[in-house]
């Protein structure tokens, strides 16, 4: 279903050795199939500089995972689906709201210039993902990976290991995807 499609899609931007760390507790055949499928061969779309892939919505688990991160991480979360019916075509259109964040824990020992350099690198990685997303619509399945508008905002979270970076919010559009 669409949640795992999103997981797979954004995993394609993560180097395999980093992606391997995402799979912590294999507990089912479906889990193993997903892990083995993604790790079998590189996507060719990996972006250098990403040191962790974090996917989910559980605030406590996210905080635990991110507290152990030392470099730049790609964090993907989702939160709502809106559906409409196009009466002219009797087609259901769905939009899934997603936030994609590229951030890095910034220790208090870093000064503002160091933080700005980190923020600039995070924005560079997020912009690279955004550029690729514009070219990735899956017309066969009726999915637009980024339905504009997309909003980029500064991300700062003391609760997530004092992380700083950039976040992009947008909708994924699809024809009857849920």
Spans of model-derived segments:
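Exposed beta-sheet edge/beta-hairpin loop segments within beta-rich domains
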Residues: 84-92, 155-162
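Short, surface-exposed beta-strand/loop "edge" segments at domain boundaries and coil↔beta transitions
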Residues: 83-84, 110, 176-178
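Acidic-leaning, charged glycine-interspersed low-complexity segments
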Residues: 118-173
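Oligomerization/assembly interface segments of phage tail-like spikes and tubes
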Residues: 92-107, 161-176
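Small/polar-rich, solvent-exposed N-terminal microdomains that initiate assembly or binding
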Residues: 1-89
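Extracellular/virion structural assembly segments
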Residues: 89-95, 103-131
């Amino acid at each position: 279903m669409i949640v795992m499609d999103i997981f797979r899609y954004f995993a394609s931007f993560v180097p395999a050795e980093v992606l391997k760390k995402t799979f912590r507790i294999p507990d089912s055949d479906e889990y193993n199939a997903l892990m083995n499928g993604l790790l079998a061969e590189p996507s060719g779309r990996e972006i250098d500089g990403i040191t962790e892939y974090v996917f989910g919505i559980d605030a406590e688990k996210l905080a635990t995972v991110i507290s152990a991160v030392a470099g730049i991480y790609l964090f993907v979360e989702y939160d709502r689906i809106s559906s409409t019916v196009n009466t002219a075509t009797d087609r259901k259109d769905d939009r899934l709201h997603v936030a994609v964040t590229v951030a890095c824990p910034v220790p208090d020992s870093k000064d503002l210039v160091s933080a700005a350099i980190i923020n600039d690198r995070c924005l560079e990685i997020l912009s690279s993902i955004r550029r690729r997303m514009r070219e990735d619509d899956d017309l066969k399945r009726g999915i637009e990976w980024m339905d504009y508008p997309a909003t980029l905002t500064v991300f700062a979270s003391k609760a997530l290991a004092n992380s700083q970076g950039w976040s992009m919010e947008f909708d994924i559009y699809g024809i009857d995807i849920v």
